[in-house]
A protein has these predicted regions:
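Conserved acetyl-CoA-binding loop of GNAT-fold acetyltransferases
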Residues: 164-168
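Conserved alpha/beta-domain cores
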Residues: 1-155, 161-163, 175-177
Length: 179
């Protein structure tokens, strides 16, 4: 991380709130221009900590979490930028809103919780052509007026860029696989 910071890298993603707190709290004081993205699942009971630490939460995927984030943001006086996670492969083991429910969920987040998502995020199923999932995500974003697309990881980020990714998650290419 220190080597990346020395090169000027300032946008980092984290999978877990507690790990991020340990890793970034002191570094934020040293590097006030850091931008932290939560790219892993967020438990509702961690919404307060996530709002305090992260600039972007990319894993908004259920009404209860939207409510918890809205409450935490109101109390903290700051709202992180939000992405709705779409489970484009409709995999049971993955988080995210089903593609057919995405429009209604985005509308509900806006209407019922007063939150304005700025983009969408997806993780395509392993073994399937990623481009199909990226195209689907881009289509959902376009019809909902969302400009940001977080899609593509170390193995498929080039394809994601071709389909309009505005950010990619390439941590394992830079830092190696998680232990």
């Amino acid at each position: 991380i220190e080597a990346m910071l020395a090169t000027g890298q300032r946008i980092f993603g984290e999978n877990r709130v507690q790990e991020a707190q340990a890793r970034w709290t002191a570094r934020r004081a040293e590097h006030p221009d850091l931008e932290l993205h939560l790219i892993g699942p967020l438990q509702t009971n961690k919404a307060k900590e996530a709002v305090a630490l992260f600039d972007v939460v990319e894993t908004l995927d259920r009404p209860r979490l939207a409510g918890a984030l809205a409450d935490a943001a109101s109390k903290a006086g700051r709202t992180p930028r939000l992405y709705v996670q779409v489970n484009t492969g409709e995999e049971e083991q993955k988080a995210g809103v089903a593609p057919l429910e995405a429009d209604a969920f985005i509308a509900s987040v806006r209407r019922d919780y007063g939150l304005e998502p700025e983009g969408l995020m997806c993780i395509p199923p392993a073994g399937e052509p990623a481009g199909l999932h990226f195209a689907l995500l881009a289509k959902i974003a376009a019809r909902n007026g969302l400009a940001k697309l977080s899609m593509g990881m170390s193995a498929d980020y080039e394809i994601a860029v071709l389909f309009g990714a505005t950010s990619v998650r390439v941590g394992s290419a830079l830092f190696g696989l998680r232990p």
